[in-house]
């Protein structure tokens, strides 16, 4: 009986020791699990911060790319506008150069001198008639067809250049050009070339 009690006591002691060992292992395991959880949480917070930074950088990059594209588009439009302006200016310059050359040629051929500085807005100058001993100053709006026709009728003389003068002064103006037209043909004044002041007046007329 005593041996049996001693054996039972030993078993109880052994079980108690095993339980204590298991309890220690369990506590150690739970401690490690808790430490792992804390580590995971810290890593998650770091990951969230990294993701936030990455998203901000991505957004900045997208904004920068959009801005760069916008600037490229704007630059392209400005280059196109500049190219169109250069083409338009070149066309206008060519047309003006042709007109100036034509006016010079016709002036020499018909003794009619045009103030080139007044073109293209106005037709201003003087027509010489040496055989009559007179000169006729004129100043009219370049788009005033009635005034130009009156001028042409007044200055019209038999000449091989008549058709060219009519072609020069009979082009139909645009609506905008008509709106911008100023006064009609100024009064035509005949002045005797033999007058003492005729040549001085002629020089002043061509300079204006």
Curated annotation (Swiss-Prot):
Keywords: Cell cycle, Cell division, Centromere, Chromosome, Coiled coil, Kinetochore, Meiosis, Mitosis, Nucleus
Coiled coil: 31-101
GO BP, sorted A to Z: cell division; meiotic metaphase chromosome alignment; meiotic spindle organization; mitotic metaphase chromosome alignment
Subcellular location: Nucleus; Chromosome, Centromere, Kinetochore
Main location (coarse class): nucleus
GO CC terms, sorted: Ndc80 complex; nucleus
Described purpose of this protein according to its UniProt entry: Acts as a component of the essential kinetochore-associated Ndc80 complex, which is required for chromosome segregation and spindle checkpoint activity during meiosis and mitosis. Required for kinetochore integrity and the organization of stable microtubule binding sites in the outer plate of the kinetochore. Participates in SAC signaling that responds specifically to disruptions in spindle microtubule dynamics. The NDC80 complex synergistically enhances the affinity of the SKA1 complex for microtubules and may allow the NDC80 complex to track depolymerizing microtubules.
Family: Belongs to the SPC25 family.
Subunit note: Component of the Ndc80 complex, which is composed of Ndc80, Nuf2 and Spc25.
Protein name: Kinetochore protein Spc25
Species of provenance: Drosophila mojavensis (Fruit fly)
UniProt gene name: Spc25
